[in-house]
């Protein structure tokens, strides 16, 4: 990436990296550190044409093992919607780079 002065690095965080929660200190510590790493890398690599972004995934993700409850259709994140967010970040023009993005299900409080 450095020789080409182009590239994208995406780091996946969680809401625990933005807000501390009871009984989550070890997890939060790692996610807070990841967010700090993303911010430092973004400032270091931005002048060299490399886009670094931190994505906060704030909610559960639907899967075959964890289907969306029929009575709560918007309670879990759709993995395809998350993938679309990552793809959008990869394709962003340099004139409008995002440094941090939060994705959460529609019913999630913030």
Where are these regions (language model features)?
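C-terminal helical subdomain
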Residues: 47-62, 68-110
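Short beta-strand segments at enzyme active-site cores
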Residues: 7-11, 52-55
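Catalytic loop of short-chain dehydrogenase/reductase
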Residues: 2, 8-33, 38-39, 43-46, ...
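A generic alpha-to-beta junction signature in SAM-dependent methyltransferases
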Residues: 1-3, 93
């Amino acid at each position: 990436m450095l020789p080409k002065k182009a590239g994208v690095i995406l780091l996946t965080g969680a809401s625990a990296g933005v807000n501390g929660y009871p009984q989550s200190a070890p997890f939060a510590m790692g996610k807070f550190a990841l967010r700090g790493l993303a911010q430092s890398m973004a400032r270091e690599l931005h002048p060299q044409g490399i886009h670094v972004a931190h994505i906060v995934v704030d909610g559960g993700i639907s899967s075959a093992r964890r289907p969306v409850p029929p009575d709560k259709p918007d309670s879990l994140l759709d993995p395809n919607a998350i993938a679309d967010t990552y793809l959008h970040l990869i394709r962003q023009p340099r004139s409008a780079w995002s440094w941090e993005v939060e994705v959460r299900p529609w019913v999630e409080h913030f």
